[in-house]
């Protein structure tokens, strides 16, 4: 059975990941793609108020389950668009440990902080300051196959460029490089060191 392809969008809250994912489902005409978003997994959790230690445990388990759900979908041949926020190093390491590196197109979704703040205030469904808190964390591993800036390109434009890049995904993907750096080469650079430049969108 041929494994499915994974388009992995990583960026802060309000950076435009979900909008790009929706456009990707519309423009991708080679295969059947599914949009898996970490926010949707969080929304499935019980609504009762949890103690801080309960919430921390629940969130970690939710994200670990999310990562393994991505892997399970792709393993049986489903193509997947992933919408995630890698704001903690362990999330990236866990994804590297469960996803096949050669199947992942890793896309960095960027947006200037002032625009993120404006979007966050306009949407009104996110805690104030969430994007600012995540801003210096989500991209610190520094290596992608492709990057886009949603302040200069529309979600549709980003999706079209991702679609165009997908057939040209190099054999040694960003996930392969990161896997070697963090899970194989124990003497290599730290999790937040910069890697080689990726294609710019």
Tell where the protein language model's regions lie, with residue ranges.
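Pre-Walker A (Motif I) flank of P-loop NTPase domains
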Residues: 2-6, 78
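Hydrophobic anchor at the beta1->P-loop junction of P-loop NTPases
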Residues: 9
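Walker A (P-loop) phosphate-binding loop of P-loop NTPases
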Residues: 14
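Conserved substrate/cofactor phosphate-moiety recognition/catalytic segment
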Residues: 22-71
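Loop/turn-to-beta-strand initiation segments
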Residues: 76-81, 103-105
């Amino acid at each position: 059975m041929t494994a499915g392809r994974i388009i992995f969008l990583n960026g802060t809250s309000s950076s435009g990941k979900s909008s790009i994912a929706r456009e990707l489902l519309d423009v991708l005409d080679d295969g059947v793609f599914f949009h898996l978003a970490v926010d949707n997994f969080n929304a499935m959790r019980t609504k009762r108020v949890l103690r801080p230690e309960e919430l921390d445990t629940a969130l970690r388990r939710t994200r670990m389950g999310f990562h393994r759900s991505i892997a399970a979908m792709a393993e049986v041949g489903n193509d997947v668009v992933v919408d995630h926020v890698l704001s903690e190093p362990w999330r990236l390491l866990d994804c590297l440990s469960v996803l096949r590196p050669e199947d992942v197109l890793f896309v960095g979704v960027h947006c200037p902080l002032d625009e993120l703040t404006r979007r966050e205030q306009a949407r009104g469904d996110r805690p104030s300051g969430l994007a600012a808190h995540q801003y210096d964390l989500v991209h610190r591993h520094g290596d992608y196959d492709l990057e886009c800036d949603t302040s200069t390109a529309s979600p549709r434009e980003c999706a079209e460029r991702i679609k165009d890049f997908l057939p040209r995904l190099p054999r040694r993907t960003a996930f392969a490089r990161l896997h070697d750096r963090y899970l194989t080469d124990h003497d290599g650079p730290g999790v937040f060191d910069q890697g080689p430049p990726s294609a710019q969108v």
